[in-house]
A protein has these predicted regions:
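Short amphipathic alpha-helical interaction segments
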Residues: 34-49, 55
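N-terminal helix-turn-helix DNA-binding core of bacterial DNA-binding proteins
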Residues: 1-39
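Amphipathic alpha-helical recognition patches that constitute DNA-binding helices
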Residues: 2, 14, 43, 64, ...
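Basic, amphipathic "hinge/linker" alpha-helix immediately C-terminal to the N-terminal HTH DNA-binding motif
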Residues: 59-80
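Residues within the helices of the helix-turn-helix
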Residues: 26-28, 45, 65
Length: 86
């Protein structure tokens, strides 16, 4: 799946917008902000596979996971914002 296909998935643009505002966010923070755990999970898996987002396991109890934008993800986020202005 390429970046444009991932961008078309429900929830992807919201995840990009949220991650653009913070260096990294835990999965639970993303779910709380977006409100759709299944949608968020699918979007994140596709974004990690497309190398738009890095997934990092945190060394804490309950093995939480955090996500952050890659350089490619930052560029796509900027492009999506510009397209949204049209």
């Amino acid at each position: 799946m390429d970046a444009f296909e991932v961008l078309a998935l429900k929830g992807t643009r919201k995840v990009l917008e949220l991650l653009k505002t913070k260096d990294r966010m835990r999965y639970s923070e993303l779910v709380s902000a977006i409100g759709f755990s299944t949608t968020t999970s699918r979007a994140l898996k596709a974004m990690v596979a497309a190398r738009l987002v890095d997934r990092e396991g945190l060394d804490e109890p309950y093995r939480p996971v955090a996500y952050s934008l890659t350089e490619k993800g930052r560029k796509l986020s900027q492009l999506a914002a510009e397209i949204g202005k049209l």
